[in-house]
């Protein structure tokens, strides 16, 4: 049963960046971790999926790769890796500091993601911060990878919109079903 005093839910969402419309969402209890929702999404070959670092799971990312789809995700932690190809430090062209092909060193990580992945370190001048991205897309430029990740912000704007405009400040019932119905109606 959901609590009436504190919103204990999560809305796991897959948004089409081109239309800014959710193509999938699932409402769960707040205890369900984001990474579990990766198993619920439908992945299409050649499509690109951009994830927050809370979704960093090498085995699941490898499954996306095996399905012929692309992923972009921010680095979580400092996984040990070896450089297969690429420069350790670039001249900062287009604010790209590193563009490397890497292989994970730890046996556990190699088992989860046995392939080669691309590691990009990008300086975002508007935020005065450096970001590290992992992707299996070796076709797009490093700058385009960083730009696609920046578009992930549309998900955050979607949730901000929900909170501001859908008036789901208090749930009308305490049961899980009541909360789900209220959120579904608000989104529709």
Located regions from the model:
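Single, function-defining residue in the core of a domain
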Residues: 2-188
């Amino acid at each position: 049963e959901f609590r009436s005093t504190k919103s204990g839910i999560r809305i796991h969402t897959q948004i089409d960046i081109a239309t800014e419309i959710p193509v999938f969402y699932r409402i769960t209890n707040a205890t369900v971790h984001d990474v579990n929702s990766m198993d619920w999404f439908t992945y299409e070959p050649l499509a690109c999926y951009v994830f927050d670092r809370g979704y960093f799971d090498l085995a699941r990312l490898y499954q996306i790769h095996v399905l012929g789809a692309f992923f972009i995700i921010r680095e979580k932690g400092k996984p040990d890796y070896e450089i297969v190809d690429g420069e350790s430090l670039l001249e900062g062209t287009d604010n790209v500091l590193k563009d490397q092909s890497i292989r994970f060193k730890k046996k556990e990580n190699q088992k989860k993601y046995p392939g080669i992945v691309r590691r990009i370190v990008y300086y975002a001048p508007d935020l005065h911060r450096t970001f590290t991205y992992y992707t299996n897309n070796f076709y797009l430029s490093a700058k385009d990878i960083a730009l696609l990740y920046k578009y992930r912000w549309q998900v955050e704007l979607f949730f901000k919109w929900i909170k501001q405009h859908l008036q789901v400040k208090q749930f009308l019932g305490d049961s899980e079903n009541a909360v789900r119905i209220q959120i579904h109606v608000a989104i529709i």
